[in-house]
Amino acid sequence: MPRIPALVPLAPWERTAQLALFMLVMLAAWRGAWLQHAHDPYEFLRHGNDSLGYYQWLPATFIHFDWSRMFWCHQMENGNWISLFTLGVAVLQLPFFLVGHAAAFTFGYDLNGFSAPYGVAMMLGGACYTAAGCVVSFRLARRFSAGLPALIAAALLFVATNVYFYAVREPMMSHNYALFLIGLHAYCSLRVLDGPRGAHVLLLVLSGALIVLVRQLNVFSLLFPLLVAGSKDRVRLFFSNILSKHASLISGLALGMLPWALQMIYWHWTTGEAITFTYGKKGEGFEWDKMVPGLVVLGVRNGWLVYTPLMIAVMTMLIRRAWQGIAPARTVLLLTCITWLLYSAWWSWHLGSGYGHRGFIDLYALLAVPLAWLIQAVMSRGLIWRMTAAITVIALVQLNMGLIERYDWFWSWEDWTWKRLFEQVSDVVIGK
């Protein structure tokens, strides 16, 4: 059975670095989003795409008091309109929406949920959850590696992957929120196995409920604690430790079920069903006979490893550690493969109008562990290895930032080709 390393408390410098990581990522993401959308913050929230689908619950609930007046819905055969998007992201955005509402009231802006104060507050919210996701990635990686490699891994997730795109250009999308939730759930799972405080149990249950409410496909990430436990005795210990904190368990269940109850009330009101697969109402779903796993990771249309090549090395390290039986490599690899195969069967396997197959972002807190292993391995090598790795990382960050700056929505369309992508890469390399 792969052994989970014992919990080692953070050193003082690591606690300081953790706070610095949060502040730097939060400020960089907030400033980047503000610069990206400052020309029209009103349109930033109104733009008709998935972002509006997640956000629309807040103005519909707190301003219009009417769920039938949401703005990005699909009309069903019975004539009713339904939001394809659940309210999980809106629950996480709520504190920042209230800040924006208070600012709009104080400074005389329109109290409509879409004026500039709401937009700036939502940018701040996205930045905070991205930063929190980097912090939980650090804490997870730190459990299985030294502090410095874990810190570098968390920072690289922000600057060298498509996390940056969804922090700056599309901060209202669900993926960075899901990254934080899955990372928090995995971290709390390990703490519950250690012998938890009440807060760990409460956050474990609450984050699990929100993970599924934000993106239902991520339900498989809830297998993490059962898989990483590694034996029946450890699984029994996991549940025993949860039940030992019954007050926290009840509180977590109550908080987690409240938004689910609201969601089911809405579904029943508009469809007559308490549990609804909303995309099915639009004729969208999984096509198991048309799976394209190769295109999901290597296709020119949003192929994960094409647009986030750092993950080639990360997956190589993950597979190696899984072969060696080092925890939690097999668990992380299994969850990554499940996600990969599910997206390969989705009717829109490339998740159009995205950058670098955004579906994998949700798992990046888990993938911070093999990334930290990779960094630790390089740091143990000689000077030439370390210099080569540093130059490679700088090049990957430059490539990531350059492609994000040049990105346009048609990159995921059918007429997007390798030739056109290489032209963009060439422009990044020569600084055009």
Pin down the residues of each PLM region:
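Start-transfer (signal-anchor) and selected internal transmembrane alpha helices
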Residues: 1-39, 122, 132, 142, ...
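Hydrophobic, aromatic-rich transmembrane alpha-helices
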Residues: 3-9, 134-137, 305-333, 367-377, ...
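Membrane-interface helix-loop-helix junctions at transmembrane boundaries of multi-pass membrane enzymes
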Residues: 7-11, 196-198, 233-253, 316-334, ...
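Transmembrane-helix signature of polytopic, membrane-embedded enzymes
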Residues: 18-21, 105-113, 132-161, 180, ...
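Membrane-interface alpha helices of multi-pass inner-membrane proteins
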Residues: 58, 154-155, 200-215, 222-227, ...
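Aromatic- and kink-enriched transmembrane "portal" helix at the membrane-lumen/periplasm boundary
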Residues: 111-134, 151-184, 188, 209-218
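Specific aromatic-rich, kink-prone transmembrane helix
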Residues: 136, 156, 177-208, 225, ...
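Membrane-lumen/periplasm interface segments of specific transmembrane helices
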Residues: 224, 228-234, 246-320, 332-343, ...
